[in-house]
């Protein structure tokens, strides 16, 4: 989550650029398919939804559309409700568009340029009035955008009357699905590396955060022995911290993160650098986090909504060099949300196989 307490309105102007970009790999057939729809939406000033599974390669799908928009002088914004997602996406955008002046706007990054090419949290859109010709909204269903009418209004007021909007998410809200014409909903069921989505497995487990439990400890120790990293999701910060204090006695390279943790960005970067083997986390890492050799465990999975479970499962198997992994839903009774999440993942795998967009 982000906020803006002091800001100035950016004076709106137009300026084109060549927007050359670099890709270190060949895009998949599905990515080209999505890219064509994005360019068409920008040209026609349409609203479309990329209903794309986690790990579909949405960031790269945007590149051709970004280039098309910038070459015709469009002001563009790539927006997400979550700071963590903005940080992740902005790195990849800057690495691809090396010669572009890109404003990265969130609570720890301020405006440097004229706002022609912006990557930001939704809160930062208060800086702009009728400025953007093209807006990409990643993780449109994420908190706080999904629950905050003023942020939804900021999206509208920052855009020109005629503009293109490209929504992107693996878990679109029913209201959004009903508002967008069927032909403008682009379903993308495959990951870019053409391997199937990991399907969750259920395990009965009742957490006792006052002692080390053999089942959880054995799984975490096996992960470490197999040189795999593990995200363990909790839906309660207090429970997570109490559990951490117990397991820290046995697992030295263990840490935790949550939305109020001022060191969370540093901890996530340390995880990527191999400093930690296991990280206890809230849903702050359910979106936007990517690394190789990663598996997830969800404590009390029966208490999560379907969308969160799909997003959490989507952390696994995202890298080309490591396209598989484990997703474990620990529960005290299988919930309907758990069943629906698993069904949605299996349905997308089936559709991707039918279209020939995955190998297995």
Q: Model-found features: residue ranges?
A:
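N-terminal pre-P-loop "Q-motif" helix
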Residues: 23-46
């Amino acid at each position: 989550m982000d906020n803006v307490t002091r800001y100035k309105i950016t004076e709106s102007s137009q300026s084109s650029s060549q927007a050359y970009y670099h890709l270190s790999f060949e895009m998949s057939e599905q990515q080209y398919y999505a890219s064509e729809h994005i360019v068409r939406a920008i040209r026609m000033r349409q609203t479309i939804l990329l209903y794309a599974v986690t790990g579909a390669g949405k960031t790269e799908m945007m590149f051709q559309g970004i280039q098309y928009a910038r070459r015709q002088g469009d002001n563009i914004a790539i927006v997400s409700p979550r700071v963590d997602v903005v940080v992740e996406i902005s790195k990849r955008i800057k690495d691809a568009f090396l010669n572009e002046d890109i404003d990265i706007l969130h609570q720890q990054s301020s405006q440097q340029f004229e706002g022609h090419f912006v990557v930001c949290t939704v809160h930062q859109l208060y800086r702009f009035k009728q400025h953007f010709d093209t807006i990409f909204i990643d993780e449109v269903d994420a908190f706080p955008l999904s629950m905050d009418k003023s942020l939804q209004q900021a999206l509208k007021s920052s855009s020109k009357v005629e503009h293109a909007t490209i929504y992107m998410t693996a878990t679109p809200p029913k209201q959004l699905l009903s508002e967008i014409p069927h032909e403008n909903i682009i379903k993308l069921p495959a990951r870019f590396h053409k391997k199937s989505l990991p399907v969750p497995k259920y395990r009965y487990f009742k957490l006792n955060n006052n002692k080390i439990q053999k089942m959880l400890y054995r799984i975490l120790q096996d992960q470490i022995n197999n040189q795999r990293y593990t995200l363990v999701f909790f839906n309660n910060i207090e429970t997570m911290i109490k559990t951490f204090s117990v397991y820290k006695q046995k697992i030295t390279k263990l840490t935790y993160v949550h939305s109020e943790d001022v060191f969370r960005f540093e901890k996530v970067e340390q995880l990527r650098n191999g400093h930690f083997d296991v990280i206890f986390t809230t849903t702050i890492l359910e979106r936007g986090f990517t690394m190789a050799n990663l598996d997830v465990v969800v404590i009390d999975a029966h208490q999560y909504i379907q969308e969160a479970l799909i997003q959490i499962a989507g952390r696994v198997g995202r890298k080309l060099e490591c396209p598989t992994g484990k997703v474990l839903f620990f529960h005290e009774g299988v919930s309907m949300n758990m069943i629906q999440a698993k069904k949605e993942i299996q349905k997308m795998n089936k559709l991707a196989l039918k279209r020939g967009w995955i190998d297995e």
